């Protein structure tokens, strides 16, 4: 949830707002009206299922590339979206290679069924924007680190905020960037954090071979009337090249 000015950006997923503080299921989810959805059911055990891309030009799918599918698993809340809601992703039920198969490789497993069951919806509420994921993309991204899941989440945040990014870093995707703001100063912390193998624990091991990086470009949005006086590396005090628009 983010509020700026009179606009509100709200992202939610799965069971957000579905329970009271005492853990009792609500008859109507606390966020359902804002999200523009009505809960109609639930699906469990969606291993080897997918989200089908309905519109590759949708802002939630920017940068996804040449694919029609995004991996999915776990549970999903079935909803009936309001007519004003856009549905960029729909559910493809579990793809099974054959009866009793424990693994299904999409290249060798025919997709026999598609649905119009939403996986994600977006729209407006008041003067703000809202996005609701019926599944748990943040958990799946945490568990598997699949890049497309991260891109969809990041795109949802950008679209909902409807404002320019305050920082943009042109670097390999394993570089972590953190921005801290203080009066008259911006501090950008970059961490070269390669991973030597994929993990499903959510914890990333440091790469065994650390390769130095160079020529990373950091772009920052300045406030009204602000100008950059100097930029330097905090560890060495070495001046850095600056270009101001």
Predicted regions and their residues:
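Solvent-exposed beta-strand/loop surfaces of large extracellular or lumenal domains
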Residues: 102-104, 108, 228-244
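Short intrinsically disordered coil segments
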Residues: 148-149, 204-206, 233-236
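Residues that form or immediately flank small-molecule/cofactor binding pockets and catalytic motifs
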Residues: 12, 92, 236
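Accessory, solvent-exposed terminal regions and/or long lumenal/extracellular loops of proteins
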Residues: 194-197, 201, 207-210, 221-227
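A glycine-rich, often tryptophan-bearing local segment used as a flexible ligand/cofactor-contacting loop or short
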Residues: 1-67, 73, 154, 158
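Solvent-exposed loop and beta-edge segments used for protein-protein assembly and interaction
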Residues: 182, 210-212
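A glycine-centered loop/beta-turn motif at secondary-structure junctions
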Residues: 5, 9, 29-32, 59, ...
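Solvent-exposed beta-hairpin/edge-strand motifs
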Residues: 84-89, 157, 212-237
């Amino acid at each position: 949830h983010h509020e700026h000015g009179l606009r509100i950006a709200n992202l939610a997923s799965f069971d957000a707002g579905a329970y009271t503080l005492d853990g009792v299921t609500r008859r109507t989810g606390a966020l359902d009206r804002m999200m523009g959805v009505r809960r109609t059911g639930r699906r469990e055990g969606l291993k080897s299922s997918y989200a089908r891309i309905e519109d590759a030009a949708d802002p939630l799918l920017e940068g996804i590339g040449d694919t029609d599918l995004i991996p999915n698993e776990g549970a999903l809340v079935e909803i009936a979206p309001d007519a004003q809601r856009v549905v960029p992703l729909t559910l493809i039920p579990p793809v099974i290679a054959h009866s009793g198969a424990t693994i299904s490789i999409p290249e060798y497993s025919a997709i026999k069924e598609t649905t119009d069951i939403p996986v994600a919806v977006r729209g407006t509420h008041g003067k703000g924007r809202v996005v609701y994921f019926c599944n748990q993309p943040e958990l799946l991204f945490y568990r598997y680190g699949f890049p497309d899941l991260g891109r969809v989440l990041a795109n949802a945040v950008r679209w909902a905020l409807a404002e320019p990014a305050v920082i943009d870093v042109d670097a390999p995707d394993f570089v972590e960037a953190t921005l801290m703001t203080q009066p008259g100063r911006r501090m950008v912390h970059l961490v070269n954090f390669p991973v030597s193998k994929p993990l499903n624990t959510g914890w990333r091991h440091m790469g065994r071979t650390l390769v130095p990086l160079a020529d990373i470009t950091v772009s920052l949005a300045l406030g009204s009337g602000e100008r950059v006086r100097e930029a330097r590396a905090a560890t060495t005090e070495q001046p850095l090249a600056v270009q101001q628009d």
